[in-house]
């Protein structure tokens, strides 16, 4: 019996010996890597790093995650009920009683909206208003005393300024990406000409749509809207345009865009000679749609528009921007050149609506 016990103990010792040898000592560990000092960066970089991290911490409480359910479509050859379609996006709180900004494409045609706050609370949301032309929407939840993000002045930003893009990419937890303003004049959409996106290299991933683009002062200067397919370029709706549209979305549920009913173009060198112009400046009227505001106001093809209610018109996008944001029914003075002579006509701004293409008077 004693012999058997000694044999078992000897076997256990052989088994445990290599395991004991496999455990590295502190001396062995020290050879595998080098410990970094507590503060290896230059003081200026450490300070900047801390400022960014502190800024991100201040912004996060007003960031929200938006979940949406839409009606699905059943296969044509199948009688089974349609599966609902689900998607996610981001948003941020602009009013402490639960008013949230997001993208129109995030909540468009939603049957059900759920908003999750940074503290984990969940609320059912309802769409207050949206505009697909600019891709902007307002959602409201029944809550009060919420943290908000202030809207800054996007006209004051400069190319090269640092920005943070916040959101819930891929439906995950909050994320923050860092970059710069790459460009200020990126055309917004064909549907809403005259307005510009903010272009940034801060990553805007799927699910970040509707989140804020924030400057180093903690002010929202844009609403993240889309990214290029390769993901290296992102675009945001400027905050000044957001401030222009939010009152209409909140009160009417939609944006009423101004409309003239003209086709326009830039002035080319051949137009300068043909129309007896002093310079290639202004907006050339290529055609006038019959029965539309421009036609009723007396505008004609080959008119060169140079000012609207005193606002200079140097290029087509100037006219598009001014007309789009002028209240419906406003009577405006249009200064123009016709046959080399300066004239002034009055036009009443109409309402833009989706319409079939009308013939244009040449």
Feature map (PLM): residue ranges:
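Bacterial N-terminal signal peptides that target proteins for export
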Residues: 1-9
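C-terminal motif of bacterial Sec signal peptides marking the signal peptidase cleavage site
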Residues: 18-20
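Serine-dependent protease modules
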Residues: 22-281, 286-290, 295-297, 316-320, ...
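Short strand-turn-strand beta-turns centered on an Asx-Gly dipeptide
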Residues: 308-313, 339
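Edge beta-strands of extracellular beta-sandwich domains
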Residues: 345-347
């Amino acid at each position: 019996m004693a012999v058997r016990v000694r044999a078992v103990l000897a076997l256990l010792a052989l088994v445990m010996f290599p395991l004991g040898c496999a455990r590295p000592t502190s001396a062995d560990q020290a050879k595998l890597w080098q410990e970094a000092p507590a503060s290896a960066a230059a003081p200026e970089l450490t300070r900047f790093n801390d400022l960014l991290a502190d800024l991100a911490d201040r912004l996060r409480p007003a960031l929200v995650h938006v979940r949406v359910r839409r009606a699905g479509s059943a296969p044509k050859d199948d009688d089974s009920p349609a599966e609902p379609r689900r998607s996610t996006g981001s948003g941020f709180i602009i009013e402490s009683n639960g008013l949230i900004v997001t993208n129109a494409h995030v909540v468009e045609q939603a049957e059900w909206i759920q908003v999750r706050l940074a503290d984990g609370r969940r609320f059912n949301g309802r769409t207050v208003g949206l505009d697909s032309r600019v891709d902007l929407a307002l959602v409201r939840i029944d809550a009060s005393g919420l943290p908000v993000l202030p809207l800054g002045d996007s006209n004051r930003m400069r190319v090269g300024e640092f920005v943070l893009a916040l959101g819930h990419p891929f439906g995950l937890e909050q994320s923050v990406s860092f970059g710069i303003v790459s460009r200020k004049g990126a055309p917004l959409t064909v549907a809403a000409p005259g307005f510009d996106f903010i272009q940034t290299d801060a990553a805007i991933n799927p699910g970040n749509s509707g989140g804020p683009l924030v400057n180093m002062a903690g002010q929202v200067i844009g609403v993240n809207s889309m990214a290029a397919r390769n993901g290296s370029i992102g675009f945001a709706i400027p905050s000044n345009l957001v401030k222009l549209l939010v009152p209409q979305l909140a009160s009417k549920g939609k944006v009423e865009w101004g409309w003239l009913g003209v086709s326009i173009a830039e002035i080319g060198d051949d137009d300068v000679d043909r129309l007896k112009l002093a310079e290639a400046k202004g907006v050339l009227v290529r055609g006038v749609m019959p029965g539309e505001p421009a036609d009723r106001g007396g505008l004609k093809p080959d008119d060169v528009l140079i000012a609207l209610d005193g606002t200079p018109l140097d290029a087509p996008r100037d006219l598009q921007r001014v007309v789009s944001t002028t209240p419906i029914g406003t009577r405006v003075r249009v200064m123009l050149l016709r046959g080399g002579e300066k004239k002034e006509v009055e036009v009443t701004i109409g309402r833009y609506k989706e319409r079939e293409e009308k013939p244009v008077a040449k």
